[in-house]
Structure formats: structure tokens, C-alpha cells
Amino acid sequence: LVAVGGVGMVALGANAVGCSGKPLGIVAIGSGNDFARGLDLPVNRVETAVEGIVGAIVRGTHIDVDMGLVTSLPDGHAIDSTDGTDVSQSRSPIDRYYAGMLSCGLDASINDRANHSHLPNGSLRYFAAVIVELTHMKSCGYHIKATLADGSVEERDIISPLLTVANSRHIGGGIEVSPYSRFADGLLDLVWLDHVPNFRECVDAVARAYHGRLLGSHAFGWKRVRDIEITRATEGDEPPVLMADGEYVGHLPV
């Protein structure tokens, strides 16, 4: 299967092949192309990408990569992946793969705003959404139960504007939110903000994100996890709609 497009099209391809073992070729011509960028695939170079795919088919070669799988817990439900509306009155369960990141907070709000922006596709649209959303951040309430990389289990509340479960390093056309993520390590990276940052911290975080040094900021927390449950905490604001790979996913708990 060959997916031609941006992050959303790659997400469709990833869900089509799932864990079937079928190879997925990517011709990255979208606005973000974060998954392709993370794999060092050609970006916005159609002929080069097609030649690479044909060569891989002829040689019978491929690389194995991890995907995240998000499923709903009781009371969690899916929404339409294209516009964020409820799928049906029956509240369908969430059951989908994602290649890049599951966005649960500020990152999801930024993605939603970028999706509805009238600016041209690309990094400018996402950067503008970042600036707008940073001006009215909320501290959302999450309760997490995570199996960490060493097999231990951690359970706690996180009251934070941002919570991301990352499989890849980049989001939004090159912003490196999770610099330690690797595509074939069997792990996900949980990244969050420890508190609502002030203006100076926001400027510092944005600058660091565009230069691959985000987790050097004291405002961020980070854990490597094998799996995680995310529910609504009793404190904090209501989290926004979850998004993954630029597509709408659904509502907590997952």
C-alpha cells in the first residue's frame, strides 16, 4: 500500500495495514510530513520517493516501525476523524493506530486551530496556532496509570496544559516535542508541562522546540512508557478532544 499525502494520509495508511505485516510506502507531499521526516524519507520530492518505493519493492526490503494503538476505556468514545463531530448516537469505541503522537491537551487545541486556519498549509499555519493557543492555556486534569520502560507501574494525577503520548519526535511540521522518541524501541514517550508557563518560559519553550532542545526546559516532564491509561482527574479543567497524526480521535478515558 502506498500513501500519497501528509500526516493524515499516512495515518489512514497506518490504520489500513495495522499489524498485518503488509508494507506501507509513503510519498510525503503534505503540510507537516512529520512521520516521513522522522524516518529520513524524501519530503515534497515525489520522484525521489517513488523511486525509493519501487527500489524497495524490487529488492524486497523494508524497515519495521512501532505504532501507537489507542483504545477507549468505558465512557470514552470516538468522533469523526475529519471534522471532530460525534460519529453516531451510539458513541462508537476508539480503536485506531497512530504513527506520530497522541495529543491530549494544548497540543490538541493547537492542532484543532491549525486545521481550521485560513493560512496557507505548512509550518506557518501551525506556528500561528501555537502563538494564539499559548495566550489562553488551561490546566487540564489527567489521571494516568503507566507501565514504565523498566516494567514498574506509576499512577498519579497530572494537572497540565499539555500531555502528549509520542511515538515520533516531531509534530507540526518540524517542532521536536519528543526528542528521545524512536520508531523501533517498543516504547512510547509521555511528555507534559509541569505548570502553566509564564511568557518568558513560553518563548524559551518554542525556541527550544524548533531546535530540538525542548526537554532541556525546566517546565517539562518526561517518562518512557510501555502502555498508559489516561482518565479525567477530579481537579483541573476538562481536557480537549484527543487528536493523533492531525486527525480527531475522541474523548477520554483511553
Predicted features, each with a name:
Residues 19-23, 27-161:
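Catalytic core of DAGKc-family lipid kinases
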Residues 13-17, 37-39, 176-177:
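Short amphipathic alpha-helical segments
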Residues 2, 25-27, 191:
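Hydrophobic/aromatic beta-strand patches that form the interior of the parallel beta-sheet core
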Residues 103, 107, 164-180, 248:
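Glycine-rich phosphate/pyrophosphate-binding beta-alpha loops
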Residues 7-10, 28, 110, 163, ...:
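Hydrophobic structural packing positions in well-ordered secondary structure
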Residues 5-6, 103:
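Helix N-cap/beta->alpha junction signal
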Residues 146-157, 176-188, 192-254:
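ATP/nucleoside-binding phosphotransfer catalytic cores, i.e., glycine-rich phosphate-binding loops
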Residues 1, 9-22:
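Short Gly/Thr/Asp-enriched flexible loops that form oxyanion-binding sites at enzyme active sites
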